């Protein structure tokens, strides 16, 4: 017990990821005067957000700012925006970058976490396990691998680095890897029209990212009829793909769905349902998607937006209790199931809900939702 008290007094809490949730967690720890180190794999804070910086969020400013972070920032003279729907770039510039600056050298950039365990204890060992600090193995962009000791670990690394493939069975379709140069797994920045104008693009997916991409391409097609767009859904019918419209809990999201339906009805977008990709082949500079039922689609570009999944590989030596379907903490799985809930109907969760059998280890943010696409920044802050 004496050793554990010493450890808690001396060692920092390590937060993995300097995205919105990781920075917010750090702000709460600073407010409680607890030492904290934030490890960010990217070259800048909020590196994942920067990759979709051109995309506009459907949450308003007040829902995108954590309370403890705001208190930390207000001490510097910062003023919180009160209305509007920012892009990812605006979120960084106005809030996330100033928050990272306020946290200062507590953040280490270019620090990729490759493993988390207990000092001198692998996953099997019970004896004295809870009395040992965590060991966090770090592979920096420059220099040799090192490890840190921590009193607690908060994994806020998100899911951005592990997108789902085009294959309908959750695995890459046959030939998908070989055709990787013709496929992208993020929402492209359509402000650069060069790669899409005058081409045929297939978008695979039914979520909000897919809707956002389809809308951008449809607007391009409206200006340039030589641009064609096909929207592929795995499900047999469109169902709730277009969202709740005026009844949507998130008005901006509802508006996206309404516009998407209008574009489909107007013929700017060709909607294909029940298309489950089994194989991807090349035909010159084009990709040919082959469905399980034998149908084919030929495209100049394929944008795969089928969701994300958590990277659990570096947590293999920890004792986790995750839902077998969602790969989320079991206590919250029923509340975030996308078959039942949408983003706006998910209740806030607390530390007790996110705790794991490994004491003092927590999954937070988008990663705590596993494969469920219903996470909102506001829910994470709460």
PLM features: residue spans?
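Conserved Rossmann-like nucleotide-cofactor binding loop
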Residues: 21, 44, 160, 209, ...
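Glycine-rich dinucleotide-binding loop and its adjacent helix/turn
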Residues: 88, 155-223, 229, 326-335, ...
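FAD-binding beta-loop-beta segment adjacent to the flavin cofactor pocket
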Residues: 57, 324-362
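N-terminal Rossmann-like FAD-binding beta1-loop-alpha1 element of flavoenzymes
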Residues: 11-38, 210-220
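A conserved FAD-binding loop/helix module that cradles the flavin
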Residues: 350-382
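Glycine-rich active-site loop/strand segments that organize a redox cofactor
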Residues: 42-94, 174, 186-190, 229-251, ...
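Feature captures the FAD/FMN-dependent oxidoreductase FAD-binding
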Residues: 79-152, 156-161, 278-288, 301
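A Rossmann-like FAD-binding core segment of flavoenzymes
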Residues: 111, 115, 219-316, 320-323
């Amino acid at each position: 017990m004496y050793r554990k008290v010493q450890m808690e007094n001396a060692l920092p809490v390590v937060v993995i990821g300097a995205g919105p949730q990781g920075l917010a967690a750090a702000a709460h720890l600073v407010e409680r005067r607890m030492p904290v180190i934030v490890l960010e794999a990217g070259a800048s804070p909020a590196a994942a957000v920067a990759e979709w910086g051109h995309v506009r969020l459907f949450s308003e400013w007040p829902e995108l700012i954590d309370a403890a972070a705001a208190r930390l920032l207000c001490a510097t003279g910062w003023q919180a925006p009160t209305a509007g729907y920012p892009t990812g770039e605006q979120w960084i510039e106005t809030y996330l970058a100033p928050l990272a600056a306020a946290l200062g050298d507590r953040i280490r950039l270019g620090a990729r976490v490759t493993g988390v365990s207990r000092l001198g204890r692998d996953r099997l060992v019970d004896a004295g396990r809870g009395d040992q600090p965590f060991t966090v193995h770090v592979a920096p962009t420059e220099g040799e691998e090192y490890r840190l000791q921590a009193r607690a670990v908060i994994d806020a690394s998100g899911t951005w680095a592990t997108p789902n493939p085009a294959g309908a069975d959750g695995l890459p379709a046959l030939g998908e890897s070989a055709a990787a140069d013709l496929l992208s797994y993020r929402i492209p920045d359509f402000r650069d029209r060069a790669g899409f104008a005058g081409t045929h693009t297939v978008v695979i997916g039914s979520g909000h990212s897919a809707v956002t991409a389809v809308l951008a391409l449809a607007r391009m097609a409206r200006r340039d009829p030589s641009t064609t767009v096909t929207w592929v859904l795995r499900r047999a019918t469109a169902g709730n793909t277009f969202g709740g419209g005026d009844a949507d809990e998130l008005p901006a999201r509802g508006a996206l769905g309404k516009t998407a339906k209008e574009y489909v009805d107007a013929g700017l977008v060709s909607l294909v349902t029940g298309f489950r990709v089994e194989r991807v082949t090349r035909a010159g500079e084009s990709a040919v998607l082959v469905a399980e039922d034998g149908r084919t689609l030929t495209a100049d570009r394929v944008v795969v937006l089928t969701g994300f999944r958590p990277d659990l590989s570096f947590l293999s030596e920890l004792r986790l209790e995750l839902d077998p379907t969602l790969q989320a903490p079991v206590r919250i799985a029923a509340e975030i199931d996308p078959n039942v809930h949408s983003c706006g109907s998910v209740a806030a969760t607390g530390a007790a809900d996110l705790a794991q059998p490994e004491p003092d280890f927590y999954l937070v943010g988008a990663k705590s939702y596993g494969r469920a696409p219903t996470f909102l920044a506001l829910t994470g802050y709460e």
